[in-house]
């Protein structure tokens, strides 16, 4: 059944393919997709590496949907494909139809690429795995690859707890969400059911409605929860273990990452590729970085006042007071010149 709201021929300006798979594995390959802008390229490359490191008996095709990509990163992705004998496809997205959609200071229009991605695979793949670029894999994905989605549009993991679901349900005026509000960073998508539900068309219609948009906090995620309410399969939290590295600033917290965790989702503004994220909880990302073409890339420094403030806080937490003072000075400098 073909029901593309976003026609691949219109939405993809160019596709660059690096296919280093052994011929025997091509037919059985499983498809994993990311939707990013250039700010998440570092994370995306390392995320792909982490999947490969922990699933070396699986043949993959990785798809990176992005609006523009530097040549240096194209070459790194080519090197990654060659090193791990995998396939990586870079899809350059035409963003014209997305430019009118609402964005926030933290999320660009790249958050809507997941709709383009799901439509792209209609009639091509029965099932695909969408991952946010701030996810590190440390376990076996075969249970997801073989999972029967039945008539569900997607398999998902809930976000936070029942109290949070209730609050989101109230804000979004959808009582069904009290049974479960999901995080959209990991989506195992049933492309046939997605097409039958016209998910992308419904999403774009809702995002054009000011009354609906006024109720949204997490644009794409809230919309997906509204459209897919009662049409998703909730799966174990180990497949989207959400953890903010800013929890490390607290006096005490419970880290949900353990040996059973398969996919770690580093939610929040501090990412594992930031130099101030030097905690054991970021090590799964760092280990994958060291096994990737980004191994010699320095961890990122703060590029705006918000990051400078978090950087300073983490410096003090890590007993680096000189760095903390310098970054607070940098924070105030950035605030003044803004």
Protein language model features and the residues they cover:
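A glycosyltransferase accessory/donor-loop signature
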Residues: 1-30, 36, 191-338
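Hydrophobic targeting segments
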Residues: 31-34, 51, 61-64, 264
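Histidine-anchored nucleotide/phosphate-binding helix
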Residues: 41-55
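Short internal beta-strands
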Residues: 60-68, 155-157
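Active-site-proximal specificity loops/subdomain of glycosyltransferases
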Residues: 73-120
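GT-A fold catalytic core of metal-dependent nucleotide-sugar glycosyltransferases
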Residues: 91-96, 110-165, 181-197
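Short, surface-exposed amphipathic charged segments that create phosphate/polyanion-binding patches used
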Residues: 101-110, 169-172, 249-254
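A recurrent flexible, glycine/aromatic-enriched loop bordering the glycosyltransferase active site
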Residues: 175-186, 213
